Amino acid sequence: MEAVRGPIRAVGRVALAAMFISGGADALLEPGPRTAKAEELGVPLDPELAVQANGAAMLVAGAALALGIRPRLAAAVLAGSLVPTTLAGHPYWQVEDPAARRQQRIHFFKNVGLFGGALLVLSERPRARRRRPPRRRTASG
């Protein structure tokens, strides 16, 4: 089982990162729809800049997670970005229309699942760095 654990983790990280990469790129390149929500919440920065900064963080951390570059740090950034995004972006309990409320609830709990996935990555033990064997010196070198 140990031989399969590495590839399973790698595939899992890529699958988890996909939503962050996609959503982050979308927020970075087309912040418009999210900007109004940021304005409503009274974000202290320029709302468009705040949305784009959050999108950039999700994109970069998602890519790092997918590539296995500092996955625990990437997961921490992603988990941290999910809390305000989820609470601000999907407050289903405030929506009157039943169909819209159902959609917002789905997105809210999808984000809760992504948060859980990020916590699982955070809970992994750090990989042991492989040490290269010492180089042998030859008489000529």
Which sequence ranges carry the predicted segments?
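Short amphipathic, positively biased membrane-proximal segments
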Residues: 1-141
